[in-house]
Amino acid sequence: LTHATAPFMTAQSIEKGVEAVVSGKYESAHSVAMLKEFLWKDGKPLNYTLDSIPRTQDLPDIYTETCGLYVYTSDLILNKGRRISDNPFLIEVNKIEACDINDDDDFVIADAIFNSKFKTE
């Protein structure tokens, strides 16, 4: 399953997900992007301490689901009613593939990516 709102998913990422699930090692696969940002929750830093503020590159590896690609077995949907298994295969994608259009600002960003990287005159 890919979403029209994630227009830059590559064939290579799709193939990785399909291969992982078809191999039988995983019931599902989905795209993720590494998030190296200072995160806060309930007024407190979530992934660092104020006593030791690291460089963003040194923050712990945290991944965000990109909503760009989901591959799963029919058994997973039928038996558990969901698209992500307990042990999913994570397909790490770059920032361009991770682009997901949910609002006007996202569309402006996607349009700029398209015009910069993919548009042929």
Per-segment meaning from a language model:
Residues 4-94:
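Conserved core of the sugar-phosphate nucleotidyltransferase
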Residues 79, 91-92, 97-121:
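Hydrophobic helical membrane-anchoring modules
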